[in-house]
Design a protein with these regions (language model features):
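Mid/C-terminal beta-alpha module of Rossmann-like enzyme folds, strongest
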Residues: 191-258, 291, 295-298
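Substrate-positioning beta->alpha
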Residues: 123-124, 152-157, 171-193, 199-203
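Catalytic helix-loop patch of NAD(P)-dependent Rossmann-fold dehydrogenases
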Residues: 99-146, 167-169
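Glycine-rich Rossmann NAD(P)(H)-binding loop
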Residues: 148, 170-175, 202-209, 220-223, ...
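Amphipathic terminal alpha-helices
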Residues: 273-281, 285-300
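NAD(P)H-binding glycine-rich loop region in Rossmannoid oxidoreductase-like domains
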Residues: 16-19, 25, 29-68, 72, ...
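Conserved Rossmann-fold NAD(P)-dependent oxidoreductase catalytic core, especially the SDR/UDP-sugar
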Residues: 68, 72-116
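Short-chain dehydrogenase/reductase
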Residues: 61-67, 103, 113-125, 145-148, ...
């Protein structure tokens, strides 16, 4: 909007309507299960960032929203005459349970991953690539570990687990990770509105690599959250996550397990990625550093 764009945003409630309007955008009441070309209207570019990102849920939830929802968004956007479709994805499309070390966009997707979030996002990417054409260009952006002020995913979890005493570092939090501050992702989206190759994927990252303990500890500390030092080895976390899933499914428990296979995996495997492609083809460079981002969180 600061650049003169008119922005519409998908909304599912009156509360979301108000939040979107307060930011100067126009709310459009729909969701991934009923979106049509009429909802897209005369928009020239679509930024698709809605997804089912929960650690736990009904078996079909990830497919319904991440695959079927993306397919509907693509169809609605193309029918409405949109020119560009920017799909916000994730490094999780690569996960099979392995470490990711010095990885770029040539690394193969994992459409048969054992983790529902990973395989559904990987297959959604495949849909986006196949939809690319001369008159409807699709671009994929892959952030890793999105963080920053206003976070509604990591910080509530850290607060709850610290308060309950459930928090434990897996393998001491020694796994190294790339990260993506929300401002850097927004900058990449702005660039992708006019730059980038159709059908291409781009990692969007902060400068540098840190251990999970360094990064999570710093984010928690910026909000006055103190995390305990307790640890559990990765193999034990993997077993605990798998066992919990079996028990929860077997007994139809409605609560979320304390640990899942996916959460055990992402907290113990390295995710060191390269963003040279985004820098070369999008002209991307981080607009905010990690230390500055943490300082802003402390001041918020």
């Amino acid at each position: 909007m600061a650049g003169g764009h008119q922005v519409r945003a998908m909304s599912r409630s009156e509360k979301s309507d108000a939040a979107i309007a307060a930011l100067g955008a126009a709310p459009v009441r729909c969701d991934l299960e009923d979106v049509t070309a009429a909802h897209v209207g005369d928009s020239e570019a679509i930024v698709h960032c809605a997804a089912f990102v929960e650690q736990w849920g009904p078996v079909d939830a990830w497919k319904r929203f991440n695959i079927d929802g993306t397919e509907r968004m693509l169809a609605a956007s193309r029918e409405a005459g949109a020119l560009r479709f920017i799909h916000i994805s994730t490094e999780s499309v690569l996960w099979r349970g392995q470490h990711l070390r010095d990885v770029d966009e040539t690394y193969p997707r994992a459409p048969n991953s054992p983790y529902p979030y990973s395989w559904t996002k990987a297959r959604a990417e495949e849909l986006v690539v196949r939809a690319n054409g001369a008159e409807f260009q699709t671009i994929i952006l892959r952030p890793r570990f999105i963080w920053g002020p206003g976070d509604t995913t990591l910080l509530p979890t850290l607060r709850a687990m610290a308060a309950s005493g459930q928090w434990m570092w897996i393998d001491g939090g020694r796994a190294r990770t790339s990260t993506t501050h929300i401002d850097n992702l927004i900058h990449a989206i702005e660039l992708a509105l006019t730059k980038g190759g159709g059908g291409e994927a781009y990692f969007v990252l902060d400068d540098g690599v840190r251990t999970l303990r360094e990064m999570i500890g710093a984010i928690a500390g910026s909000q006055g959250i103190s995390l305990p030092d307790r640890e559990i080895p990765a193999w034990a976390a993997d077993v605990a996550g798998a066992t919990a899933e079996i028990v929860w499914r077997l007994f139809g428990l409605r609560s979320e397990p304390p640990l899942t296979r996916f959460s055990a995996m992402i907290m113990s495997r390295e995710a060191v990625l390269r963003d040279g492609k985004a820098r070369a083809e999008l002209g991307y460079a981080p607009v905010i550093g990690v230390e500055e981002g943490l300082a802003r969180m402390r001041q918020a």
